[in-house]
Amino acid sequence: MPEELSKKQITRLNKLQKRLRREVGSAIADYNMIEDGDRVMCCLSGGKDSYAMLDILLNLQQRAPVQFEIIAVNLDQKQPGFPEHVLPAYLDSLNIPYHILEKDTYSIVKEKIPEGKTTCSLCSRLRRGTLYGFAQRIGATKIALGHHRDDIIETMFLNMFYGGKMKAMPPKLLSDDGANVVIRPLAYCREKDLEEYAELKKFPIIPCNLCGSQENLKRQAVKDMLNQWDRLYPGRIETIFTAMQNTAPSQGVDREQFDFVSLKRDPNAPMKGDVAEADLPAFDFLDIANSGHIDLDAAKRINIVNVYEA
């Protein structure tokens, strides 16, 4: 039996719960993630993030102004030592509809990826294909994944450093074939909050023996970099995420996002700047000697030091 929480832990849990619910609710509202009548397929891996996502969505479901279904789905990828009983027991205790899928993607990954190489990319691609197909089978209108704000920021830096792209994880995504809408309700949540929440809630965490324990992954290096920034410069991570929500294509260099080629000056645009002040009289800028005796504030006068004549 799990140990009872202390009063201090209960207070902390309540505070965390309110914060996470508020952040998830804001993300759902900002990106219109869940609508009335939706059937949400909540993908459960057995990790802290997906447990927290399911827990918070179930709570919000009771208070939401719209009606929606939640169906939990886990994909058993046949990793050695995977405790098959853990998730069914947990989901039974919640008394919610769920499906456990079985597909041996583990063998495929081990066969295709040389020893010591990162397996995450192929593993996630195989898992995604299976889950997308199953979502269509059960009539799910949304697929909820447990990626949080740190995942989104890390992905942006990974794509910058190793892919040469300014690309991250969108909170809401339409699949390439247009058949599925993927949502990330934890998009505004910090990983450290989710870790603490999972610990206090005592979720039955299942570690990933295939990729989660591999060292020297590129993502881990980026995560370490961001954690160091967070320690040295509090608030920087929040600022980075805010910047990702406030892009200005016209101030960048991506010709696909902004039509720089067609930029033309407007010859009829009004003059702006100090010399355009309404209280300044019009004068000939080439009248260096000021023969018109116009009294101008020296700070606002253009000082023409030389005139070039062709």
Curated annotation (Swiss-Prot):
It catalyses: cytidine(32) in tRNA + S-sulfanyl-L-cysteinyl-[cysteine desulfurase] + AH2 + ATP = 2-thiocytidine(32) in tRNA + L-cysteinyl-[cysteine desulfurase] + A + AMP + diphosphate + H(+). Gene3D superfamilies: HUPs. GO terms for biological process: tRNA thio-modification. Pathway: tRNA modification. It is found in: Cytoplasm. A motif (PP-loop motif) lies at residues 45-50. Binds 1 [4Fe-4S] cluster per subunit. The cluster is chelated by three Cys residues, the fourth Fe has a free coordination site that may bind a sulfur atom transferred from the persulfide of IscS. It comes from the Bacteria. [4Fe-4S] cluster binds at residues 120, 123, 211. The keyword Kinase does not apply. Its cofactor is Mg(2+); [4Fe-4S] cluster. Its EC number is 2.8.1.-. Its main location: cytoplasm. One of its GO terms (molecular function) is ATP binding. Disulfide bonds: none annotated. GO terms for cellular component: cytoplasm. Pfam families: ATP_bind_3. The thiolation reaction likely consists of two steps: a first activation step by ATP to form an adenylated intermediate of the target base of tRNA, and a second nucleophilic substitution step of the sulfur (S) atom supplied by the hydrosulfide attached to the Fe-S cluster. Belongs to the TtcA family. Homodimer. This is tRNA-cytidine(32) 2-sulfurtransferase. The gene is ttcA.
